[in-house]
């Protein structure tokens, strides 16, 4: 009968072989659009339809985080700055935290709730707190996207809820990531 350490070793070998087979498959991942980039060098390892436009959905919140943390870095706000849930933020579709209008949260907590729960209301709270309005914040998002070289991206809201004109590509998201 095999010992526990022997079984554990066999499982490790089986896992390693499985990972190696997946890694060596020419098309290990399938998607309408994909771009696999080596983080340290920027070398493209695999690309399929990397420049076709597509709807960004909740990955929009990565740019919301980027713009908010840039404002912190520039000293315009701090992570302890209080922001208020507006009626517009409170009315966002789920996923959301569901705070009542008038509730105050810190930038830090709003960021955490937005990123962990994908809270659409917190994305709007951050947009209004940093950019003054959804439109003002969307302009900041687009300015930053252009500055980063994201030439196929246009943002119209901070949370990724369906909106005409909100578009990106796998290539542009790789730049942001």
Which stretches of residues belong to each language-model region?
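Active-site-adjacent loops and short helices of periplasmic peptidoglycan-processing enzymes
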Residues: 26-171
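Extracytoplasmic
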Residues: 172-177
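Bacterial N-terminal signal peptides that target proteins for export
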Residues: 1-16
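Bacterial N-terminal signal peptides
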Residues: 14-25
């Amino acid at each position: 009968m095999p010992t526990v350490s022997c079984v554990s070793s066999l499982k490790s070998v089986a896992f390693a072989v499985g990972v190696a087979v997946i890694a060596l498959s020419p098309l290990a991942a399938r998607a309408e659009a994909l771009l696999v980039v080596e983080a340290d060098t920027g070398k493209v390892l695999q690309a399929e339809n990397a420049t076709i436009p597509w709807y960004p959905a909740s990955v929009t919140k990565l740019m919301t985080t980027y713009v908010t943390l840039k404002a912190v870095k520039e000293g315009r706000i701090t992570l302890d700055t209080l922001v208020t849930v507006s009626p517009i933020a409170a009315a966002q579709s789920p996923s959301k935290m569901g705070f009542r209008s008038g509730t105050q949260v810190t930038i830090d907590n709003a960021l955490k709730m937005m990123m962990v729960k994908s809270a659409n209301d917190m994305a709007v709270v951050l947009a209004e707190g940093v950019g003054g309005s959804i439109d003002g914040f969307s302009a900041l998002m687009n300015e930053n996207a252009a500055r980063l070289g994201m030439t196929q991206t246009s943002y119209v809201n901070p949370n990724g809820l369906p909106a005409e004109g909100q578009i990106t590509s796998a290539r542009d998201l790789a730049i942001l990531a």
